[in-house]
Amino acid sequence: MEEVPPYSLSSTLFQQEEQSGVTYRIPALLYLPPTHTFLAFAEKRTSVRDEDAACLVLRRGLMKGRSVQWGPQRLLMEATLPGHRTMNPCPVWEKNTGRVYLFFICVRGHVTERCQIVWGKNAARLCFLCSEDAGCSWGEVKDLTEEVIGSEVKRWATFAVGPGHGIQLHSGRLIIPAYAYYVSRWFLCFACSVKPHSLMIYSDDFGVTWHHGKFIEPQVTGECQVAEVAGTAGNPVLYCSARTPSRFRAEAFSTDSGGCFQKPTLNPQLHEPRTGCQGSVVSFRPLKMPNTYQDSIGKGAPATQKCPLLDSPLEVEKGAETPSATWLLYSHPTSKRKRINLGIYYNRNPLEVNCWSRPWILNRGPSGYSDLAVVEEQDLVACLFECGEKNEYERIDFCLFSDHEVLSCEDCTSPSSD
């Protein structure tokens, strides 16, 4: 088994095969506290192209003290439908039953996303697997398309989940972030008005039944992740970070656990490269919580303030039944032009405007999709991310670091214009 010690040391979990062209993309990472286990997922493809995705792969990592020992790679052949390719791993852990739900989509043959959007004919199926032994074995695949989407799928040109992890809210609700290309208008047999919008798939009965929430509108949003942050006592807020084609990241808030979101806003602190890129977000509780903080331009702000990003007058405060003093970590390439220099940003006051730090660069050079996981009992953070020397498709690396490294880093740099 391969051992990965902290801090800030990367280990390659999935490596592109130069001879065959086999490529691993779309990382998803889940940490299971009871067994101190990491589950690292990715797509196995016969080339870098989306339409050449084949199946999902998994590696299990065991925390030993403050390092990780990784087991061998396993093909998840359970996560397949006949005549379909499997894409977009999105795992979530249900703490009451101990089950891991692995969501993904199965897309018919080699039908491209563009083809589905142009013709307005969906070729994707919403599926999941369940594991009751921390990812050692998996049950049979279940197709949830009819149950969750039903007849609405006729208006969805295509859709996907995640990619990256889902979460369980303080209330017990399970959340799987998703997005769909909604067809609002047709001309003859063509879908002439199709826009992507993020939404949530959720379960309130420990994963027995699943439903979907409303689209995040009117901003065009796509791949997304969510995190729960502290609002008024008893009223936690769900924060959503979504990819856009608008050069900046979109942020939206929900006060009803993801059923619907208020109008999203573009954050000028969080740049998207020209083609956009997926990003990851997690909430965490820092060891030391000061009463005031300094933002990236040196202005102090009290720890409790009115929230201008929400329609309702929520305040940030500690509550007995809600997450206490929750901050956010966000991973994303920092360049305004291309996918390079993966940065880790933190936000000490998620409900306030423009409170993101400058990025701590986790990986210099080509960097793509990423997924974060918090190891709360060790005060560590893990990141699974695409990277390489010439392009970001060469490998998927795992890195373990402490929140202290991010919070105390003096070598923070502004987003690159390269």
Curated annotation (Swiss-Prot):
Main location: membrane
Segments carrying motif FRIP motif: 24-27
Domain of life according to the entry: Eukaryota
Keywords: Carbohydrate metabolism, Cell membrane, Endosome, Glycosidase, Hydrolase, Lipid degradation, Lipid metabolism, Lipoprotein, Lysosome, Membrane, Phosphoprotein, Repeat
Keyword presence, rRNA-binding: no
Gene Ontology terms, MF aspect: alpha-sialidase activity; exo-alpha-sialidase activity
Spans of repeat BNR: 129-140, 203-214, 254-265
EC number: 3.2.1.18
Entry keyword Membrane: yes
Family per record: Belongs to the glycosyl hydrolase 33 family.
Quaternary structure (record): Interacts with CAV1; this interaction enhances NEU3 sialidase activity within caveola. Interacts with EGFR; this interaction mediates desialylation of EGFR and enhances downstream signaling.
Protein name: Sialidase-3
Organism: Mus musculus
Underlying gene: Neu3
